[in-house]
Regions:
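Positively charged n-region of N-terminal signal peptides that target proteins for export
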Residues: 1-4
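Catalytic cores of eukaryotic secretory-pathway lumenal/extracellular enzymes that build
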Residues: 200-201, 240, 249-251, 257-262
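Helical hinge/lid and interdomain linker segments adjacent to catalytic or ligand-binding clefts
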Residues: 24-25, 30-34, 64-74, 124-232, ...
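Bacterial N-terminal signal peptides
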Residues: 7-17
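Hydrophobic targeting/anchoring helices
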Residues: 22-129, 138
């Protein structure tokens, strides 16, 4: 009996010592991580429980650290995320390393989970949405909204808005030439026209312009917007065309403005300027903002882009947006694949560019009190995502660098604002 008592005593003492030393949880985001994407969802879940998380910029791929909590540890185990239990001494040593002036690292405190809205139609369309898939796989909650919710003022209820494969010019993705007789295309146009009338607009392009202008004002007021693929360039094209008509009659029932190109207003756009719009309904292109890779580079084995490295202590925003375990990422195509650098406004920060430096894949900029991020391409793990292709299974791409960039944007609004260094 006495022997059992001492065995229990030493077991409890040892367990207590382990607990006393394990005061923090470190979630490494370097190549050792087993599921990078779910790690973001775990961080979001932790914030939702009222606990802060430190984002260790440029430390082991942009790792996360939080105070030890049994509930957090349980979630990490359930979700299959690699983590380390560390003591106070180790945690402080990491913070000292990250905050050292000699290292290009810093710590950003994440304090509150952002309220996320995804702008997407209820109608099922024959292509996937990379952000919807990323949020779903990472287990990050979101609310799906569309035109009605935007024009009725609901956007102010959210901190972060995502746009993906959308056409804000009212030209239905410029799919007319190839798909105008496809049932899904006909239904898309019928549904959009009915919704525009129900919301008090004469045509779809007018509704989409109102939506784009409302989103722009949302960003000016302090919101965060992330757009991919055609959701990025058509957003600015629609804003620029607010005084004119760039849509052919097959899209909106009336003629183009004869001087439409000269009537574009680049003062109200967010990222792009001085672009030429394509008003040919038979051309699968909206403008010369987008640049397709040359034919010899339209290959996943040769198409890539490189992220820029920023000063973590002086430029925390672009540093957060580019956290990754690799610096060079595989390219991927979309209706808007990469942006022509000469069309980008000087107020925009380039985050990632293609070889040669003439085209940009990833960018961000401030507008008023808010920020926007544009990301070229459709699906980071499907080089050519054709109409009708099945959605990507992210369980097969748990450490996708391309999808990590999307999820960096999800956490960015949770960061505690630091005073600007002078």
């Amino acid at each position: 009996m006495q022997k059992k008592f001492f065995s229990l005593f030493w077991a409890l003492l040892l367990f207590g010592n382990i607990n006393s030393r394990a005061q923090s949880i470190l979630i490494p985001m370097d190549e050792t991580q087993t599921d990078h994407l779910k790690a973001y969802g775990l961080v979001y879940w932790t914030l939702a429980q009222g606990m802060d998380v430190d984002w260790l910029l440029n430390y082991r791929g942009g790792s996360f650290m939080a105070a030890y909590n049994t509930a957090v540890e349980k979630e990490l185990l359930i979700r299959g995320i690699l983590f380390e239990r560390i003591g106070d001494g180790t945690a402080q040593s990491i913070l000292n390393e990250v905050q050292s002036p000699s290292n290009n690292m810093d710590v950003v405190k994440l304090e509150k989970q952002p309220r996320i809205a995804v702008y997407a139609p209820k109608q099922v369309l024959p292509w996937d949405d990379a952000v919807l898939m990323a949020l779903t796989y990472a287990e990050v909650p979101y609310t799906q909204i569309y035109d009605k919710e935007i024009v009725s003022g609901e956007l102010q209820n959210y901190d972060w808005l995502h746009l993906h494969h959308e056409d804000f010019t009212g030209q239905y993705g410029k799919f007319y030439a190839q798909y105008r007789n496809a049932p899904w295309y006909i239904e898309q146009q019928r549904t959009a026209e009915a919704e525009a009338r129900n919301l008090g607009f004469r045509k779809v392009s007018q509704l989409k312009l109102a939506v784009a202008q409302t989103i722009r004002q949302y960003v000016l007021n302090g919101g965060f917007m992330f757009a991919m693929c055609s959701g990025s360039d058509t957003f600015d094209i629609a804003l620029a065309a607010h005084k004119t008509d760039i849509a052919a009659a097959v899209f909106d029932g009336d003629a183009l403005s004869p001087n439409a190109q000269n009537e574009l207003d680049f003062d109200v756009t967010m990222a792009f300027q001085n672009f030429q719009v394509s008003m040919n309904p038979m051309e699968y292109e909206h403008s010369d903002i987008d640049v397709m890779p040359p034919p010899h580079l339209q290959d996943p084995s040769t198409d890539f882009f490189t992220l820029f490295e920023f000063s973590a202590k002086w430029d925390p925003v672009p540093t957060m947006l580019t956290q990754n375990h690799v610096a060079t990422l595989r390219g991927f195509m979309g209706q808007a694949t990469q942006y022509r650098k000469e069309k980008i406004k000087p107020t925009v920060t380039i985050l990632g560019e293609s070889p040669g430096g003439e085209t940009v894949r990833y960018l961000y900029g401030p507008v008023g009190k808010g920020f926007f991020t544009f990301y070229g391409g459709h699906d980071p793990e499907d080089y050519r995502h054709y109409v009708g292709d099945p959605p990507t299974d992210l369980a097969l791409h748990k450490s996708s660098p391309g999808y990590r960039l999307i999820l960096n944007n999800v956490l960015f609004p949770a960061a505690k604002k630091k005073p600007h260094k002078t």
